[in-house]
């Protein structure tokens, strides 16, 4: 089995990178790909950089060169569901863009032309994530994660997302681009992110303070999922 793992920022991948055995580094187009073994499973861990373009590029390199059987997107997110606190987990059952608008041509809000309205995570990976959450005693919410090239910390941006995607549980900047590329390659994916902030006018302050907490939670969950896939759980 080969597993692809992708995160945007140094803090989001550092803990997992340090756990990879026999690691080798490939650097291409601004992305870092660490290949090796995690709990005896072949993995490739990508640090893509921030935003949709960087995420799509990193995912394409991952899928084209490493050819994993599945992709896990890890990292942090801004919480929208009222029950979420810093360090809690969101598990995607679907992802959508919040900053795409071609509704003039009959598409749904967030739907890119000639693409699905949403990208659905593999049910087996969603179940795996939720089972891993339960074993770790974490709190998680499953649902819609929305992505866009904006850090949401203003009232207007938040109101737009809540009005357009009232069912959204979290917002971040890469997941839908990753899912979009996985869809193009027909590779199953799931997004498991930890909450670093609630998407409000103080979110930039809490993000800086709690990114490490979120990274610890999401990395711990990814490790648990890998161990389960390796038959160690």
From Swiss-Prot:
Q: Which CDD domains match?
A: MTAN
Q: Keywords in UniProt for this one?
A: Amino-acid biosynthesis, Hydrolase, Methionine biosynthesis
Q: Which organism is it from?
A: Sodalis glossinidius (strain morsitans)
HAMAP family cross-referenced by the UniProt entry: Salvage_MtnN
Judging by the UniProt lineage, the source's domain of life is Bacteria
Q: Quaternary state and partners of this protein?
A: Homodimer.
What is the protein's given name? Answer: 5'-methylthioadenosine/S-adenosylhomocysteine nucleosidase
What Pfam families does the database record attribute to this sequence?
A: PNP_UDP_1
Classification via InterPro entries: MTA_SAH_Nsdase, Nucleoside_phosphorylase_d, Nucleoside_phosphorylase_sf
What does the record give as EC number? 3.2.2.9
Q: What class of enzyme is it?
A: hydrolase
Q: What does this protein do?
A: Catalyzes the irreversible cleavage of the glycosidic bond in both 5'-methylthioadenosine (MTA) and S-adenosylhomocysteine (SAH/AdoHcy) to adenine and the corresponding thioribose, 5'-methylthioribose and S-ribosylhomocysteine, respectively. Also cleaves 5'-deoxyadenosine, a toxic by-product of radical S-adenosylmethionine (SAM) enzymes, into 5-deoxyribose and adenine. Thus, is required for in vivo function of the radical SAM enzymes biotin synthase and lipoic acid synthase, that are inhibited by 5'-deoxyadenosine accumulation.
